[in-house]
């Protein structure tokens, strides 16, 4: 009598965020199926949870068109090799974690060979290049989506999708400790506090920092006690921001932070930030915000034609209305940004109403995503 093979799950993560998701999924699966086997492309966190790495995650983690072109032969070789090896292994389920340009084609290749496939983290198909939904539908048996409006989009096209909630919503408390965050950052409890988050990419920091600093200067005229915290993702962005500040606002006192974006949001009465995941994190930190964003004119012209959503920030997309002010392109200028932030710093009716809605939205997407993802994998494996 042959021994039954353990549940075998193949996974591919292409960057750090995917490694974190993959590790959480593996942990949740091991609790239910302790002898399960995990193989694929993994980062250090997934490997620490017991995933066998056929390739290191860094092999896939390339950013930008030039870098991708330089590595294209290697990436295509890895994908062909994984198609062959996973095809021979016949895992019970393949889970492609984010990295859609790499994973969706791989999922399609494996599905043709009879392997059940899951795409974990929906690409922004609801916002632009919507026709990708048909390719995703052909390539996957199931999409795992973080946000409810993503599931609604897939339902419209009859692509199987499961809303599992957002891991960030699971990780952050419903009622953050504002005073605790202020203790960590050295901000007095009774001071007004503004967080400036000009983005994580060099182009964003270059485009937004000057106007964000000028906005803070205007706000300091109304609130002389205003504490300004500026978390920056790495040394390169900090150096870039310091250079711009020396040109634009050399005398403006600010607290520059290495990382610590979440602490800055929790500690602040209001935040001015670039769009993106930071807006979702700020919502979960219950920090009232204004979104300011600018890009090169041609890029903006193109985006207006390609993007199919009414709003750019995730809090507004979740709420289905303009919950937070979005000031884009020419609108993203100091006078308008300051005018939008003033009522939030006053900490009155406007910011309290925003805080309450943020809490409701947090509860909507706080669904224990790791457990939900593990359940979906096991159901498909049966």
Curated annotation (Swiss-Prot):
A GO molecular-function annotation: lipid-A-disaccharide synthase activity
Pathway entry: Glycolipid biosynthesis; lipid IV(A) biosynthesis; lipid IV(A) from (3R)-3-hydroxytetradecanoyl-[acyl-carrier-protein] and UDP-N-acetyl-alpha-D-glucosamine: step 5/6
The keyword Transferase is assigned to this record: yes
Top-level lineage group: Bacteria
EC id: 2.4.1.182
GO biological processes: lipid A biosynthetic process
Record-linked InterPro entries: Glyco_trans_19
Keyword ATP-binding tagged: no
Matching Pfam families: LpxB
Catalytic activity: 2-N,3-O-bis[(3R)-3-hydroxytetradecanoyl]-alpha-D-glucosaminyl 1-phosphate + UDP-2-N,3-O-bis[(3R)-3-hydroxytetradecanoyl]-alpha-D-glucosamine = lipid A disaccharide (E. coli) + UDP + H(+); a lipid X + a UDP-2-N,3-O-bis[(3R)-3-hydroxyacyl]-alpha-D-glucosamine = a lipid A disaccharide + UDP + H(+)
Cellular component per GO, a single term: membrane
This protein's UniProt keywords: Glycosyltransferase, Lipid A biosynthesis, Lipid biosynthesis, Lipid metabolism, Transferase
Coiled-coil region list: none
Record-linked NCBIfam families: lpxB
PANTHER family according to UniProt: LIPID-A-DISACCHARIDE SYNTHASE, LIPID-A-DISACCHARIDE SYNTHASE, MITOCHONDRIAL-RELATED
Protein family: Belongs to the LpxB family.
Function summary: Condensation of UDP-2,3-diacylglucosamine and 2,3-diacylglucosamine-1-phosphate to form lipid A disaccharide, a precursor of lipid A, a phosphorylated glycolipid that anchors the lipopolysaccharide to the outer membrane of the cell.
Record-given protein name: Lipid-A-disaccharide synthase
Originating gene: lpxB
